[in-house]
A protein has these predicted regions:
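NTP-dependent small-molecule kinase module
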Residues: 3-7, 121-189
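Hydrophobic/aromatic beta-strand patches that form the interior of the parallel beta-sheet core
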Residues: 18, 74, 112-114, 163-165
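ATP-dependent small-molecule kinase phosphotransfer cores
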Residues: 11-105, 177
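A glycine- and Lys/Arg-enriched "phosphate-lid" helix/loop adjacent to the NTP-binding pocket
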Residues: 82-149
């Protein structure tokens, strides 16, 4: 994200780099609740509602104002993550997710979605190298297989929006895959 934001800024673009859940003080507080390991099991519906609560705040406070100014927004995750994690990963009701998306996201949709795809074993190994796993990172392999499959299906169903990158390679190779996408983005008005 930082590499892409730097290249866009060098091309004269004003760029907001953000993440979900999070991106504002309130949304970051919700993120902390979502990700903190706890002895109390969080209900799946609670997780879904918290994700959308953080997103509503993020859209209102950061994303929509940036877009209204004509800024570019690079977000590490957005609504596709909800379909993957809460929809496929948790098996939550698709209609409920659709209704929440319509209520919260409305017509604020990405122009392009970059899917940094890695085999589940690679992703889990990378996460395992961090100091401590968060609540979601502690899930089992089957959970992450469902998530990856959902992302791949969404990318296949929306090829005009998604660009799939092989993120199992080293950082320089990932950046090499990003370069033509950056050039494509810079043709946008």
């Amino acid at each position: 994200m930082d590499w892409l934001a730097t290249r866009l800024r060098e091309a004269g673009k004003t760029v907001l780099v953000t993440r979900e859940p999070g991106g504002t003080p309130l949304a970051e507080s919700i993120r902390n609740v979502l990700l903190a390991p706890s002895d109390e099991k969080m209900a799946d519906d609670t997780e879904l509602l918290l994700v959308f609560a953080a997103r509503a705040q993020h859209l209102a406070e950061k994303i929509r104002p940036a877009l209204e100014r004509g800024d570019w927004v690079l977000s590490d995750r957005f609504v596709d993550a909800t379909w993957a994690y809460q929809g496929a990963g948790r098996g939550l009701d698709q209609d409920a997710i659709s209704r929440l998306e319509a209520l919260v996201v409305r017509d604020t949709q990405p122009d392009m979605t970059l899917l940094f795809d890695v085999p589940v074993d690679v992703g889990m190994a990378r996460a395992g190298k961090r100091a401590a796993l968060d609540r979601i990172e502690q899930e089992d392999r089957a959970f992450f297989e469902r998530i990856r499959q959902c992302y791949q299906e969404r990318a296949g169903n929306e090829p005009d929006r998604f660009r799939v990158l092989d993120a199992s390679c080293d950082l320089d190779q990932v950046r090499a895959q990003l370069q033509p996408l950056l050039e494509e983005m810079l043709t946008w008005s």
